[in-house]
């Protein structure tokens, strides 16, 4: 048995417990499909990823965005040389390594899973002056390179995540969901919290994905954010008010600011903050008034004690 985050188990329970071992071995097997030529194996994988809209602009109506990164054979040949080894890319199997995805790409990828292999190009504009968006590209079904039958075990695994896996604390009594937790490790500081979900499980109406920087485990923060949004959309109200209050009362700015300071120091552009003179004056005035108030209270107490 291989120890560590779930072991090398079959697909469904590996999705359920987010097994790094299983997915690393699966990715390694793909790279080793062509002995001595891992570039060919990673190119086959990259081609499939591109068909989900990853590693490229989605051709949507957003003015800004990022292609992210799906590394191919040329990428690794440039980085490690033509004789690079599969183990140098194995971390891609667990979603780490050189893979870069945007939140909208994660949501779109999840929508393709819900549809068993196709997706509409995501867009913001639904209608103009009450008329449907005339852009035909948003009405075309984009087919992925994965046969619909291969999505069934993935969907069962995402169902198990919520029923008895890493996302079980987010299960709702009012709607079913399919989900995947994610914890993107950061070299320094807390990890990024990632979660993506489909609801309802048997008749999908909404996909929600969230990435919360330096927040920790996926099910701890990004998961509650996603499930609260889905709940409001599907039910028209919030049944789990405690999740909403916990989210709106939280702040990750301290860790985010710390990471920013680390970055500035790394590139030699950090300058210690200079105390604002007006702010310091206000603090000093407040302390003076507080001291005067305390002295007044002390004097009154002394007078009271002297009274026969």
Model regions and ranges:
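Short amphipathic alpha-helical face segments that pack within enzyme cores
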Residues: 102-108, 221-228
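Extracytoplasmic/secreted cell-surface and envelope-processing proteins
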Residues: 23-25, 217-221, 239, 243
